[in-house]
């Protein structure tokens, strides 16, 4: 049995399953079945759609049903009508879908939010990204993007594990909104940076787990690292925001 802090930490790790080639699709779908019963859930997006089609997205959602959060990451960024069509076609079976906050409210995110509400899914808005280029455009506009998020009232927002100071700023502005933080591992963020230093609810880990020959052990290793950094914080806080 995991120590209490590790048991809490593993429930804060979402595994990103992004195939690099067509041959990876089946392997990552098999992995979905394994990690969904251990971690917080999975995130799939454009690589899975491009290489496996909408059927692969639906299969990932099916395999993880009842095993954690199922996050669809298409980073939607269009007028409301187009985002609504995409959500109606691809979001069924997922607990949450990601879109860009910069689209704005009127004629955009308000329509997507209404569509997702009708599908029983939650909206997650990107307010900052994990790559260095986010500093060029998104981060200078962070206050405006957070204002959009306050107006839209999404379930969650995306903020980068690679810059925990941004996560902390988002947490200060949106104290009750779920924060999902990508960029752990290959992009340079250390496990626990976003949760322990920034106040994120979830960290998203991709290649560090998905590229391992033993993904469950790799996932537990990430959780152990997080737990060692801030056990008290983990034990005295709970996301309470899993799928209903």
UniProtKB/Swiss-Prot annotation:
SUPFAM superfamilies (alphabetical): Ribulose-phoshate binding barrel
Lineage: Archaea, Thermoproteota, Thermoprotei, Desulfurococcales, Desulfurococcaceae
Cellular component annotations (GO), alphabetically ordered: cytosol
E.C. code: 4.1.1.23
Keywords: Decarboxylase, Lyase, Pyrimidine biosynthesis
Keyword Lyase in record: yes
Record Pfam families: OMPdecase (PF00215)
Subunit structure: Homodimer.
Annotated substrate binding sites: 18, 43, 73-82, 130, 182-192, 206-207
Keyword Transmembrane helix: no
Active-site residue numbers: 75
Name under which the protein is recorded: Orotidine 5'-phosphate decarboxylase
Recorded family membership: Belongs to the OMP decarboxylase family. Type 1 subfamily.
SMART domains listed in its UniProt record: OMPdecase
Functional pathway: Pyrimidine metabolism; UMP biosynthesis via de novo pathway; UMP from orotate: step 2/2
InterPro entries, per the entry: Aldolase_TIM, OMPdecase, OMPdecase_arc, OMPdeCOase_dom, RibuloseP-bd_barrel
GO biological process entries: 'de novo' pyrimidine nucleobase biosynthetic process; 'de novo' UMP biosynthetic process
Annotated catalysed reactions: orotidine 5'-phosphate + H(+) = UMP + CO2
Species name: Aeropyrum pernix (strain ATCC 700893 / DSM 11879 / JCM 9820 / NBRC 100138 / K1)
Function: Catalyzes the decarboxylation of orotidine 5'-monophosphate (OMP) to uridine 5'-monophosphate (UMP).
An MF annotation (GO) of this entry: orotidine-5'-phosphate decarboxylase activity
């Amino acid at each position: 049995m995991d120590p209490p802090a590790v048991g809490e930490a593993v429930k804060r790790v979402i595994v990103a399953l992004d195939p690099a080639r067509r041959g990876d699709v089946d392997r990552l779908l098999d992995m979905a079945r394994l990690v969904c019963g251990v971690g917080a859930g999975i995130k799939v997006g454009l690589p899975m759609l491009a290489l496996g089609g909408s059927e692969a997205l639906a299969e990932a959602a099916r395999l993880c049903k009842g095993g954690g959060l199922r996050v669809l990451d298409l980073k939607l960024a269009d007028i409301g009508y187009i985002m609504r069509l995409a959500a109606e076609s691809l979001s069924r079976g997922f607990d949450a879908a990601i879109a860009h906050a910069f689209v704005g409210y009127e004629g955009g995110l308000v329509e997507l939010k209404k569509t997702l509400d009708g599908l029983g899914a939650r909206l997650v808005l990107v307010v900052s990204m994990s790559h260095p280029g986010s500093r060029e455009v998104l981060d200078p506009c962070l206050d405006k993007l957070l204002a959009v998020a306050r107006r839209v009232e999404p379930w969650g927002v995306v903020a980068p594990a690679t810059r925990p100071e941004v996560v902390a700023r988002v947490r200060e502005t949106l104290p009750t909104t779920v924060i999902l933080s990508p960029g752990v591992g290959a992009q340079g963020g250390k496990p626990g940076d976003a949760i322990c230093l920034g106040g994120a609810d979830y960290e998203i880990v991709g290649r560090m787990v998905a590229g391992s020959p033993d993904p469950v052990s790799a996932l537990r290793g990430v959780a152990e690292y997080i737990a060692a950094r801030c056990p008290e914080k983990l034990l005295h806080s709970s996301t309470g925001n899993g799928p209903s």
